[in-house]
Amino acid sequence: MRCVPVFIILLLLIPSAPSVDAQRKTKDDVPLASFHDNAKRTLKRLWNKRSCCPQEFLCCLYLVK
């Protein structure tokens, strides 16, 4: 039971994470979500261009080359 107060004091001494970014964003900073959105959009566009049948997925692999 002697450890509980020490543990609580240690928790209070640990600094909490800042709620605001410490570094300013530059024009090169892009959120990771936009990369995922761009990848999904590109894959969807390529899938529509290939006009593959979903039953035969291998036909899509041959059209990529």
From Swiss-Prot:
Q: Which GO terms describe its cellular component?
A: extracellular region
Bilayer-crossing regions? none
Q: In which tissues is it expressed?
A: Expressed by the venom duct.
What InterPro entries does the entry give?
T-conotoxin
Q: Where in the cell is it found?
A: Secreted
The positions making up the signal sequence are 1-22
Recorded hits in Pfam families, A to Z, give: Chi-conotoxin
Propeptide stretches are: 23-50
What does the PTM comment state? Contains 2 disulfide bonds that can be either 'C1-C3, C2-C4' or 'C1-C4, C2-C3', since these disulfide connectivities have been observed for conotoxins with cysteine framework V (for examples, see AC P0DQQ7 and AC P81755).
Coiled-coil residue spans: none
The GO terms this record gives for MF are: toxin activity
The answer, when asked if Transcription is one of the entry's keywords, is: no
Could you list this entry's UniProt keywords, alphabetically sorted: Cleavage on pair of basic residues, Disulfide bond, Secreted, Signal, Toxin
Quote the record's domain comment: The cysteine framework is V (CC-CC).
Task: Give the protein family.
Answer: Belongs to the conotoxin T superfamily.
- Provide the protein name: Conotoxin Lp5.1
Q: Which organism is it from?
A: Conus leopardus (Leopard cone)
